[in-house]
A protein has these predicted regions:
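Short hydrophobic/aromatic-rich beta-strand segments that constitute the beta-sheet cores
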Residues: 83, 131, 165-167
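Short beta-strand edge/turn micro-motifs at domain boundaries
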Residues: 22-35, 149-173
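Bacterial N-terminal signal peptides
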Residues: 6-16
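Exposed beta-sheet edge and beta->alpha loop/turn motif
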Residues: 127-161
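A solvent-exposed, acidic/Ser-Thr-rich amphipathic alpha-helical stretch
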Residues: 48, 52-53, 70-127, 136, ...
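A generic structural motif
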Residues: 84, 138-140, 171
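Positively charged n-region of N-terminal signal peptides that target proteins for export
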Residues: 1-5, 21-22
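Short, low-complexity N-terminal intrinsically disordered segments enriched in polar/charged residues
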Residues: 22-79
């Protein structure tokens, strides 16, 4: 018993702490690293706040699309984005950027609008949000306006107050 107390006091002296200040588990006092401090998770947005946030992101992102500003548009996508398109297949960030640049070059008058009443927003716990809607693309072809609707699901990740798209599923073209 006496040797255990002696070892404890020796370890305590070597660790530079006092018995009153010792708040970490015994394992930490024996040389194990202390666990990292948890980063506080921001308070989740209310359902209405989340909806308004994603609706605003949709408006801003597609303003960049309609302006054919590829760099500004791609700022909304995470570097590790996976874009699944029913006609074009799976693309990564670079391929998606190249596809938008080609689209804007081939159809310089293309525009996108959100179909009114189609926007749905759902929280993704400890991650961000799902953004589901129907969109309408229009451009002039052979002297006439050509429009078509498609559907999409976007998964937005929120990190340090910044929202980025990590997954896109675009379908029903």
């Amino acid at each position: 018993m006496r040797s255990s107390l002696g070892i404890f006091l020796l370890l305590l002296a070597l660790s530079g702490t006092t018995a009153h200040a010792q708040t970490t588990p015994r394992k930490a006092a024996l040389g194990s690293p202390t666990p990292p401090t948890a980063v506080p998770v921001p308070k989740p947005l209310t359902k209405d706040e989340l909806y308004q946030t994603v609706a605003q992101l949709d408006t801003e992102m597609f303003a960049a699309f309609n302006a054919h500003d590829v760099n500004k548009l791609m700022a909304y996508f995470a570097d590790n984005v996976e874009f699944y398109h029913d006609k074009g297949g799976l693309t990564n960030f670079t391929q998606t950027k190249e596809a938008f640049a080609r689209l804007f070059a081939q159809s310089p008058d293309i525009t996108r609008t959100l179909v009114p009443g189609s926007l749905e927003v759902y929280p993704v716990k400890n991650y961000g949000a799902m953004h589901i809607a129907t969109q309408r693309f229009c451009h002039v072809e052979n002297g006439r306006e050509d429009c078509g609707n498609s559907k999409f699901v976007m998964v937005w990740q929120q990190q340090a107050g910044t929202w980025r798209i990590t997954r896109v599923v675009s379908y029903d073209h």
